[in-house]
From Swiss-Prot:
Originating species: Poecilotheria vittata
Domain of life: Eukaryota
Statement: the UniProt record of this protein carries the keyword Disulfide bond: yes
UniProt cross-references to SUPFAM superfamilies, sorted A to Z: omega toxin-like
Further information: Exists in two forms, due to cis-trans isomerization at 33-Asp-Gly-34. The cis isomer also acts by shifting activation of the Nav1.7/SCN9A channel to more depolarized voltages.
InterPro entries from the UniProt entry: Huwentoxin-1
Keyword Disulfide bond among record annotations: yes
Protein name, entry field: Beta/delta/mu-theraphotoxin-Pv1
Function field: Gating-modifier toxin that targets voltage-gated sodium channels. Inhibits the inactivation of Nav1.7/SCN9A.
Annotated Pfam families: Toxin_12
Length: 36
């Protein structure tokens, strides 16, 4: 499966690649979580 990249659709943070987190509200996509 692999992880979702920036702006990839998601349901939770674990769907996203490292340093990305899932947005809590619509539209739900992976965004940078502020970490390096």
């Amino acid at each position: 499966a692999g992880c979702k990249y920036l702006f990839g659709s998601c349901k939770e943070d674990s769907d996203c690649c490292k340093h990305l987190g899932c947005r809590r509200k619509a539209p739900q996509y992976c965004g940078w979580d502020g970490t390096f």
